[in-house]
């Protein structure tokens, strides 16, 4: 019924060459529960993902929440619901057709979502590669109510029809109501009532990058790895494990972080569409190498990142661990160098491969 994301091989390869460092910094631990402040309640900022039958739901550290529905026939279409944490916010529902030939549909063709015989026409998103449409404003509330109570949903356009699963829809929306303090309020997704809503979103952490520094002598193009890093037992092991491909072994990159610190990335594993590197923070010339500690939204730091790129102008290191080659599922992360450490800037994650573009994945971590 669903197309699962396969990250197992990459994670096993990663684990074979790395061990988390004791005492490594992690993303700031958000509140586990809501907190009362005056007459308002500060919502929980704990990132979380849940599965409700066929539906996936997630809320990030700012209490922005999402729910996703797959097509009954795998890889044919999807539905995305998002809801900001403001008590008066309205949900946004997006749908996407991903069936064979969908990309050739007339760009002006309407996308229609029919729920138990009731048709809702969505506004097309103009700049999407695949047919994607959006319900928003006052038109979205009837759609949400129908999804929660519905038995059958069909997405159609230009003669194509794709059935979307509603199994778990009401439970996923109820969970979002609970996370955002909407139960029994007028703006609840499912359990609507008259209780006044008085909630405040959790404050997002502020991340400030260190000033940019010159990069003369650093970058890509297979720089020579300093001897102090080559001598590390973990690096020797991973050099051996990547020796089957001479091009993988050359995927070393470096950067100057400041006058006293450098960044060096060493290939650790490679697959058809993922390249993992271990990152070290060193002294000048690669001396005194220490594995970098990259915090993650769910609290477990790592020193290995996948398909990584470092932008010295913004002091940002990005990673994109693909669940499959087309990149419609996986984990996308960015960290900012503050002058003392790499701090998580943002993270989004799509566990199910169903054709959702990466810019529409649910966020787990956001910053200011």
Predicted regions and their residues:
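Structural motif
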Residues: 272-280, 327-333
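Surface-exposed loop/turn elements that mediate protein-protein interactions on large endomembrane-trafficking
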Residues: 231-241, 281-297, 336-341
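Exposed beta-strand-loop-beta-strand "reactive/processing" segments of non-cytosolic proteins
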Residues: 252-272
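Short aromatic loop motif centered on NTY/YTY
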Residues: 290-368
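A generic "folded-domain core" signal
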Residues: 17-244, 254, 275, 344
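Sec-dependent N-terminal signal peptides
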Residues: 1-21
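Beta-propeller blade termini
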Residues: 250-256, 305-309
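Short consensus segments that form the blades of beta-propeller domains
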Residues: 102, 268-272, 323-326
